[in-house]
C-alpha cells in the first residue's frame, strides 16, 4: 500500500492520530496508530488504533459500541501525523462517557470540566 510507505512512523513504529467529528469539526480524541492499525483502518473504513499501555491493537468501540466510521483520512505536510475525520457512532468518543476526550479547559491556573457526561462509563463498559 503506497500510503503506508509514504507515512512516517516514529522510532517505535507509531504515528499520532487526531480524530475529528466529520459533521461538526469538533476534535474528539487523540490516539496512536501503528502500520497494522492504519492499514486496517483504511481497509475496514473503521478506526483501529494501537494501545501503548496494552501493547495491542485497539478496535475503537469494540466494547462500548461507540465505533468511528471513517469519512476522510488526511496526513500533515510532513506525513508524520494522521487526521481521521469520522462519524462517531453513539456520539461518545471518550471512555469517560463524554463526546470528546478534550473536556477540560484551562481556567486561569486550573483545569475546569466544560462538558457533561452523556452516559455513565459503568453503563458503557459492563
Swiss-Prot record:
EC category: hydrolase
The EC number(s) this enzyme carries: 3.5.4.19
Residues noted as binding Mg(2+) in the record, renumbered to the chain: 76, 78, 80
Keywords: Amino-acid biosynthesis, Cytoplasm, Histidine biosynthesis, Hydrolase, Magnesium, Metal-binding, Zinc
One Gene Ontology term from the biological process aspect of the record: L-histidine biosynthetic process
Pfam families reported for this sequence: PRA-CH
Pathway: Amino-acid biosynthesis; L-histidine biosynthesis; L-histidine from 5-phospho-alpha-D-ribose 1-diphosphate: step 3/9
Positions bound to Zn(2+): 77, 94, 101
Keyword Nucleotide-binding: no
The keyword Repeat is annotated on this UniProt entry: no
Compartmental location: Cytoplasm
GO cellular component: a single term: cytoplasm
GO MF, one annotated term: phosphoribosyl-AMP cyclohydrolase activity
Cofactor binding note from Swiss-Prot or TrEMBL: Binds 1 Mg(2+) ion per subunit.
Reaction catalyzed: 1-(5-phospho-beta-D-ribosyl)-5'-AMP + H2O = 1-(5-phospho-beta-D-ribosyl)-5-[(5-phospho-beta-D-ribosylamino)methylideneamino]imidazole-4-carboxamide
Signal peptide: none
Cofactor: Mg(2+); Zn(2+)
Family statement drawn from the similarity comment of this UniProt entry: Belongs to the PRA-CH family.
Protein purpose: Catalyzes the hydrolysis of the adenine ring of phosphoribosyl-AMP.
Oligomeric form and interacting partners: Homodimer.
Database matches in PANTHER family: HISTIDINE BIOSYNTHESIS BIFUNCTIONAL PROTEIN, HISTIDINE BIOSYNTHESIS BIFUNCTIONAL PROTEIN HIS7
Alphabetized NCBIfam families for the sequence: PRK00051.1 (NF000768)
Protein name (Swiss-Prot/TrEMBL): Phosphoribosyl-AMP cyclohydrolase
Protein species of origin: Ruthia magnifica subsp. Calyptogena magnifica
